[in-house]
């Protein structure tokens, strides 16, 4: 089965405005094609992705207001279908963009386990990162974004982040600054594409067999103070129940939010 890569351009510039980040993406796409990987690029800001979330995304209108339809279910389906997810983000204020952060927040709600594998839905998928900016911030953004994607189930290979940084102060962007001729950036893009492609092939052949339910149960039995995740396919928000091990007496129940 052919592997698929989805690259999310999280620039804050809508089409048809020029995106410096798209310049980095344009270097990565043909490299994925050489690897035999089908690649799709989505500019997130061009689509209606609500920042708000609901306990039950499919049926939230039990309250006073009806949920306004947005395009998150459409984008989520593309993320589910992709073997490789690459977040491509400008660096703003030493961070990823708000559009990238919304994607991470939305994915953080995907806590349901696959009934067959007993794993999170993003297991056996690979994550990569492209960053574009000036001055500093690339290592900080890589650390936070890739760590969060790994916590959500993605596998992160070595050298999974590539970036271009301009000179200190205001200066030309990736396109005007001829970032496509910059050795270190070109090297890192090739590292990222090669390693995400390699790991995706490995996981297609030999996926993880970790049973998260069994691991949680074993941990529960050896622990005195247990936070057990209540998993519900139709209610993506994570709920925690805290139990006192002695007698399994329920002492607290809360919902993140």
Curated annotation (Swiss-Prot):
Pathway: Antibiotic biosynthesis. One of its GO terms (molecular function) is oxidoreductase activity. The lineage of its organism: Bacteria, Bacillati, Actinomycetota, Actinomycetes, Kitasatosporales. Changing residue 240 to A: Loss of synthase activity due to the absence of substrate binding. The keyword Transferase applies. This is 8-demethyl-8-aminoriboflavin-5'-phosphate synthase. Homotetramer. Changing residue 55 to A: Loss of synthase activity due to the absence of substrate binding. The record marks 13 as: Important to position the amino-group donor glutamate. Disruption phenotype: Cells lacking this gene are unable to produce 8-demethyl-8-aminoriboflavin (AF). Belongs to the SsuE family. It catalyses: FMN + L-glutamate + 3 A + O2 + H2O = 8-amino-8-demethylriboflavin 5'-phosphate + 2-oxoglutarate + 3 AH2 + CO2 + H(+). FMN binds at residues 11-13, 19-21, 91-94, 132-136, 240. InterPro entries: Flavoprotein-like_sf, FMN_Rdtase-like_dom. Changing residue 21 to A: Strong decrease of synthase activity. Keywords: Antibiotic biosynthesis, Flavoprotein, FMN, Transferase.
